């Protein structure tokens, strides 16, 4: 089996994959060519859609993204190719990042950080409290759910 990995990996991760799939051919390429796609039985990662992924021999496309909308359009993949995504993998990390960015924005932390770096302690806009605020979450998949769960504390 020929496995094409175009997901962003650290060197140690690449080495582990090669060691685990010792009986298979593993090609690791951040920018796969059409020739790489043409020869792959399995693709791990999100290959560019300008490549022809509609290959009869392609058994599976294992995306490293939570969404797969662009890959399910008619003609992108062969009907026999299995498609998976990483839905559920990013909810906690991204939701905590979103909450951190909300607090940073609402409390003008960027302004304060820049002033602190420059040694200036100038009065600045107070900012807005998150407590009892309304938040609109667009999309209620795993990431939206995890954001809502954390915002409930406010």
Question: Which residues make up each language-model segment?
Answer:
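Short, well-ordered beta-strand segments
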Residues: 3-4, 62, 84, 136
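Short secondary-structure boundary/capping segments
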Residues: 18, 34-35, 73-75, 126-128
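A short, aliphatic-rich alpha-helical micro-motif
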Residues: 36-38, 55, 130
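Phosphate/diphosphate ligand-binding glycine-rich loop within oxidoreductases
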Residues: 41-113
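A short, basic/flexible loop-to-alpha-helix module at the beginning of a structural domain
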Residues: 118-128
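Rossmann-like dinucleotide/phosphate-binding beta-alpha-beta segment
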Residues: 126-154
């Amino acid at each position: 089996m020929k496995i094409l990995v175009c997901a962003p990996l650290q060197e140690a991760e690449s080495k582990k994959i090669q060691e685990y799939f010792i009986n298979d051919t593993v090609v690791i390429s951040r920018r796969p060519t059409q020739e790489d796609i043409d020869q792959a039985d399995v693709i791990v990662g999100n290959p560019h859609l300008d490549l022809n992924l509609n290959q009869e021999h392609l058994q599976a496309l294992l995306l490293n993204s939570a969404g797969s909308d662009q890959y399910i359009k008619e003609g992108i993949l062969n009907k026999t190719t299995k498609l998976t995504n990483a839905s559920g993998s990013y909810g906690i990390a991204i939701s905590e990042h979103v909450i951190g960015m909300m607090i940073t924005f609402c409390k003008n932390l960027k302004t304060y950080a820049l002033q602190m770096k420059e040694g200036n302690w100038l009065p600045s806009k107070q900012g807005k409290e998150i407590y009892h605020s309304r938040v609109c979450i667009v999309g209620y998949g795993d990431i939206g759910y995890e954001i809502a769960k954390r915002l409930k504390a406010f």
